[in-house]
């Protein structure tokens, strides 16, 4: 497959992945209070716990998934990660307590590994003289996804509801 096509596909994948991690930023406090019954005096604490839990677990799991990718195959692990991320967002739409939401975000962190898989896959396809460009594009679209996420999440929550935004994100990642 042509490296430019691979870069385009992976870039789209990265934008969705990165946006999914940050999409709940605009409505997380409201989701916690209005949907999950958190008292306003505890919403800041729960927001911090819920949001950070993904990244704590992800930091632990990403190298493990990377090692599995070396054994099982990079494409298989990328598909696995996308599917598990999609499931995690579906679960975000059905949780009923802040603890369940925290576990969902931890599961999301457990599912992490898409970024290292995408990097590894790109190194297989990019010509050596274009690898730096490809990795730079990938980093740029990851940053763009992180910026797009709150805008997308806020818009989805505004027009479709906070719970529905999780289901739509799940569909986008699937």
Task: Name every feature range the model reports, one short phrase each.
Residues 29, 145-157, 161:
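Small-residue (Gly/Pro/Ala) motifs that create kinks and tight helix-helix packing interfaces
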Residues 60-92, 96:
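Conserved MFS/SLC helix-loop-helix module at the cytosolic interface between two early adjacent transmembrane helices
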Residues 88, 99-107:
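Paired small-residue
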Residues 165-174:
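Symmetry-related core transmembrane helices of the 12-TM Major Facilitator Superfamily/SLC fold
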Residues 104-142:
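Cytoplasmic helix-loop-helix junction between adjacent transmembrane helices
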Residues 55-63, 113, 146-147:
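Residue-level signature of mid-helix packing/kink "hotspots" within the transmembrane helices
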Residues 3-27:
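Pair of pore-lining "gating" transmembrane helices in MFS-fold secondary transporters
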Residues 31-58:
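Extracellular/periplasmic helix-loop-helix junction of adjacent transmembrane segments
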């Amino acid at each position: 497959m042509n490296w430019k096509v691979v870069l385009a596909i992976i870039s789209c994948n990265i934008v969705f992945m990165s946006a999914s991690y940050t999409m709940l930023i605009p409505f997380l406090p409201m989701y916690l209070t209005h949907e999950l019954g958190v008292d306003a005096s505890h919403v800041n604490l729960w927001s911090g716990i819920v949001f950070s839990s993904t990244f704590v677990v992800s930091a632990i799991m990403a190298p493990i998934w990377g090692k599995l990718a070396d054994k099982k195959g990079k494409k298989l692990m990328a598909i696995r990660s996308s599917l598990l991320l999609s499931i995690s967002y579906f679960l975000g739409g059905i949780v009923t307590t802040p603890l369940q939401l925290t576990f969902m975000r931890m599961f999301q962190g457990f599912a992490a590994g898409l970024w290292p898989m995408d990097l590894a896959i790109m190194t297989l396809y990019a010509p050596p003289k274009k690898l730096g460009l490809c990795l730079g594009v990938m980093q740029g679209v990851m940053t763009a996804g992180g910026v797009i996420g709150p805008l997308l999440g806020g818009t989805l929550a505004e027009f479709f509801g906070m719970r529905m935004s999780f289901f739509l994100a799940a569909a986008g990642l699937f």
